[in-house]
Curated annotation (Swiss-Prot):
Single GO term (MF): DNA-binding transcription repressor activity
Origin superkingdom: Bacteria
Function: Transcriptional regulator that represses the expression of ydaS and ydaT under normal physiological conditions. It binds to its own upstream sequence and represses the adjacent and divergently coded ydaS-ydaT operon. RacR-mediated down-regulation of ydaS and ydaT may be critical for cell survival. RacR ensures that the prophage DNA is maintained in the genome. When the expression of the racR gene is reduced, the prophage Rac is excised from the genome, possibly to counteract the lethal toxicity of YdaT.
Something else known: Encoded in the Rac prophage region.
Entry text on domains: Contains a DNA-binding N-terminal domain (NTD) and a C-terminal domain that facilitates oligomerization.
Protein name: DNA-binding transcriptional repressor RacR
Annotated transmembrane regions: none
Key words of the record: DNA-binding, Repressor, Transcription, Transcription regulation
Native organism: Escherichia coli (strain K12)
Gene (name only): racR
Disrupted gene: phenotype observed: Deletion of the gene is lethal, except when the adjacent ydaS gene and the common intergenic region between racR and ydaS are also deleted, or when both ydaS and ydaT genes are also deleted. Down-regulation of the gene leads to up-regulation of the adjacent ydaS-ydaT operon. RacR silencing causes striking morphological changes in cells, significant growth arrest and cell death. RacR silencing does not affect biofilm formation.
Subunit structure: Homooctamer.
């Protein structure tokens, strides 16, 4: 992992690439995304220091324009939750993501961005398909929740 001035340069380069890609318009917009004031972004660049808790979001936010090697990493670290089941699930998801094609990764990045940035390949068909998927998954999850609740109902009283 880069640190100091090298990290500052890497942050500045990533911001410039993000602006050049058209997904953000300014450093101020980047600051808003990270819920910090614009001077903080300038400090990140100048001093190369950023709060460790912001690193995963930094990597995620710029993942459409730079990879882990840009930050001096071989791969992005996997979050380590306390629950071992969740950890195993995250490892599985990460392995699937790493094995996915560039096209699948681009789709995942777009979906996880919350439609904050819209690549050129996104058109009304893609938006309609995503809306339909979200609606179907919503119905599916509600049905699962309803089924789970009905199985947990126990008879009480006399």
């Amino acid at each position: 992992m880069l640190s100091g001035k090298d990290l500052g340069r890497a942050i500045e380069q990533a911001i410039n690439k993000k602006i050049a890609s058209g997904s953000v318009k300014s450093k101020a917009e980047v600051a808003r995304h990270f819920k910090v004031q614009p001077p903080s972004i300038y400090d990140w660049i100048k001093k190369g220091s950023i709060s460790k808790d912001k690193l995963p979001e930094l990597w995620r936010f710029f993942s459409d324009v730079v990879g882990p090697e840009h930050w001096g990493l071989n791969e992005y670290p996997i979050p380590t939750p306390t629950n071992s089941d969740t950890k195993s699930e995250l490892l599985d998801i990460n392995n699937l993501y790493q094995a996915a094609s560039d096209e699948i990764r681009a789709i995942v990045a777009f979906l996880l961005s919350g439609n904050a940035t819209e690549p050129d390949w996104v058109d009304h068909d893609v938006r309609a398909y995503i809306a339909a998927m979200e609606m179907k998954v919503g119905k599916y999850l509600k049905a699962l929740e309803s089924e789970r609740k009905s199985q947990n109902i126990t008879k009480t009283g006399t």
